[in-house]
Every structure is written in structure tokens, then in C-alpha cells.
Design a protein with these regions (language model features):
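Proline-rich low-complexity regions
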Residues: 56-57, 133, 154
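Extended hydrophobic/Leu-rich segments
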Residues: 70, 129, 149-150
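Core catalytic region of metal-dependent phosphoesterases/phosphodiesterases
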Residues: 2, 9, 13-121
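Single conserved hydrophobic/aromatic residue that forms the stacking wall/gate
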Residues: 149-159
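Short amphipathic alpha-helix with an adjacent loop that forms part of the alpha/beta core around
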Residues: 140-148
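Beta-strand-turn-beta hairpins that frame and shape the catalytic cleft
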Residues: 1-4, 121-131
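Short beta->alpha connector loops
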Residues: 133-139
Length: 159
């Protein structure tokens, strides 16, 4: 299984600069998406800070983020995972409210993309991964405990 890794994309960077937005768009359309197709990569993991501003998002940026990135990944059949980063949450002490949940959450509990606001283990294609989002007061103990399990028993998944 091949996986593409992205991080710190900061959609809306530089005060929602449209010049930066166009630059990012060229990267995704001319390099990233063709690379996924050419190399038959079906899974993408984003390591956090998918958006730039902690408190709000510009509607133009949001529209382009959804149409040029999220919906394109979905249309390509990409299994997309997002680990919540510090720029993805408005509060420093909790991940409970986060950009991905607010933008893409549904009442039915189905999510695209999949996002992780708490530390947890997942298995992708037979490979175990420990995902740890932005660590803060509300998840510090659980994140530390999961990390210590993997340090003491690196081949064991936490239950």
C-alpha cells in the first residue's frame, strides 16, 4: 500500500491571499493529483494544520478548498485522513470543536474526510499507525498514555 503524506497546507495562508491560493492550486492540479494517479496512491494522510486561521475561514478560500481539493480527492476515490492540528481548532485547550468537523461533519456520523481529534490507533492496509493530533489540556493524558504503550510495546496496538 502506498500512502501520500501532506502537512501544514494552511488553506487561507497570508491573510487569504488569492496569489497563494492560485500557487497552491497549481501544485495540486499539476503535481499532486497527477502523482496520485500515476502511482496508484489511494490513501492520503494530512498531518495537521489543513486550514490557516484558528477562528474563521474566508468563504472564497472555503469554496476553493472544498471544490479544488476535498471533492477532487473524493471523486478520485481517495481514502483521506486528517489529523487535527493546532491551526484546525479555535481553542488551545481542546480539539472538540475543529475545522474538519464543522465543515464536513454529518448528523449520520459518516465523515469525508476521516479526521482524528483524539489520539488513536488505526490500521491502513495491514500497517498499524498511531495518530496523535494537537496535544492540549483535554487530551494530554490520553495522548501520553497511548504514546507510552507504543514506546514500551511498539508492535502492540492499544485497545
Amino acid at each position: 500500500m502506498r500512502v501520500a503524506i501532506l502537512n501544514d497546507t494552511h488553506w487561507g495562508a497570508r491573510n487569504d491571499s488569492l496569489a497563494f491560493l492560485e500557487y497552491f492550486h497549481k501544485f495540486y492540479d499539476n503535481i499532486f493529483f497527477p502523482y496520485l494517479e500515476k502511482n496508484n496512491i489511494r490513501t492520503v494522510i494530512h498531518l495537521g494544520d489543513i486550514v490557516d486561521r484558528r477562528k474563521f475561514i474566508n468563504y472564497i478560500i472555503l469554496n476553493r478548498f472544498k471544490t479544488d481539493f476535498i471533492y477532487k480527492l473524493k471523486k478520485m476515490g481517495i481514502d483521506f485522513h486528517v489529523i487535527i492540528g493546532n491551526h484546525d481548532v479555535p481553542y488551545r485547550n481542546t480539539n472538540k470543536i475543529n475545522a474538519m468537523q464543522e465543515l464536513f461533519g454529518t448528523d449520520s456520523g459518516t465523515w469525508y474526510p476521516k479526521f482524528y481529534s483524539e489520539a488513536r490507533d488505526i490500521n491502513l492496509g495491514g500497517t498499524d499507525l498511531c495518530l496523535i493530533p494537537w496535544i492540549n489540556n483535554s487530551n494530554y493524558t490520553a495522548s501520553l498514555q497511548l504514546s507510552l504503550i507504543h514506546i514500551s510495546e511498539p508492535t502492540r496496538l492499544a485497545t
